[in-house]
Amino acid sequence: MKILVTDDSKMARKMVIKTLNEDIEEDLEIFEAQNGQEALDLYKEILPTIVFLDLTMPIRDGFTALEKIKEFDKNAKVVVISADIQKLSMDRVLKLGAFDFVKKPIDSTKMKQILKKLN
């Protein structure tokens, strides 16, 4: 399974990757991006199974990256990760086509549930 983890914080990316590697008993190919533009470019190159995407990033924020990824591939599975998921943001990402969302700090049980929904 190819997974793209996008966050401007290297520590946040490492936490998501650590959670995935510890809790998922499947072969994972994990790629990293540090902003929304990198995520979009990398998505087009590797066509990951799922994308974990932070909302607040420089260059291209998560909202715009989500929108552009969905324009490129309407079937893309994008999971929004954010410390501050307000109702307004939640409504917006769901309208843009987010597959699911995870609140920071990362809950490994939630991550497992999301990956099970892919099958």
Where are the model-predicted features located?
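Helix N-cap/capping motif at the beta->alpha junctions
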Residues: 32-41, 62
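Receiver (REC) domain active-site loop signature in two-component systems and cognate sites
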Residues: 57
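Active-site beta3 strand of CheY-like receiver
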Residues: 46-52
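Short amphipathic alpha-helix used as the core "switch/output" element in two-component signaling
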Residues: 41, 63-74
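A Lys-centered signature of the CheY-like receiver
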Residues: 104
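Two-component/phosphorelay signaling modules centered on CheY-like receiver
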Residues: 10-31
